[in-house]
Regions:
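Gly/Ala-rich phosphate-binding loop of Rossmann-like dinucleotide-binding domains
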Residues: 13, 17, 102
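Rossmann-like adenosine-cofactor binding region
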Residues: 30-123
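N-terminal Rossmann-fold NAD(P) dinucleotide-binding loop
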Residues: 9-10
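Hydrophobic Val/Ile/Leu positions in short beta-strands of Rossmann-like dinucleotide-binding domains
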Residues: 1-2
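Glycine-rich Rossmann-fold phosphate-binding loop(s) that bind the pyrophosphate
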Residues: 5-6
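Residues at the starts of beta-strands that form the adenosine-phosphate
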Residues: 21-22
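Conserved SAM-binding motif I beta-strand of class I
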Residues: 25
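C-terminal helix-to-coil terminal segments
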Residues: 109, 116-169
């Protein structure tokens, strides 16, 4: 299951499908038709995603609405033996609630590329918990070169045509 079907979510879905996985997705801002056009099954709400999937991969931004939104009530809906994968932001996870749920459910697994604040507490779930010390998603040589090229192209487009396509504020 893919929570948030932006660029990263779409790529994860494509890779998962390449392994023969049946892929589901939910994105509050992406039309179901766009999800289905990518060969992915759209669900109506995030609860349905967590109830349906053996693995849920998070790709949501950390906003006022999403911070702490991945909580025990939501993760508790996951199937027996399910895996929660967080490659989004650590702020979206309600760590105290997830810790408590993992105490209660010995079948639940959590994988993250962002070391949680409560890493020492999660460490007791050896074999069911894995994290990396820092977010590595975009820290490859190729990604850094591409980011530099993209920034240069955007600056050039602004001065040449007044293009503000990627304006942040």
């Amino acid at each position: 299951g893919i929570l948030a079907f932006g660029n990263v979510g779409r790529n994860v879905a494509r890779i998962a499908a390449g392994f023969g996985m049946e892929v589901y997705a939910y994105d509050a801002f992406c039309p179901k038709e766009a999800i289905e056009a990518a060969g992915v099954k759209a669900v109506d709400c995030q609860d349905a995603l967590f109830e349906t999937c053996d693995v849920v991969s998070l790709h949501i931004p950390a906003t006022a609405e999403t911070k702490q939104s991945i909580n025990a009530a939501l993760v508790g809906k996951m199937k027996k033996g399910a895996v929660l994968v967080n490659t989004a932001r650590k702020e979206v996870i309600n760590e105290p609630e997830l810790l408590k749920l993992m105490e209660e459910r010995a079948d639940l697994k959590y994988v993250t590329d962002i070391k949680p604040d409560a890493d020492a507490d999660f460490a007791k779930f050896e074999g069911r918990y894995f994290s990396t010390p820092k977010k590595m998603g975009a820290q490859t040589a190729e990604a850094n070169i591409n980011a530099g090229i993209a920034a240069a192209c955007q600056i050039n487009a602004f001065f040449k045509d007044g293009c503000t396509k990627f304006k942040v504020n």
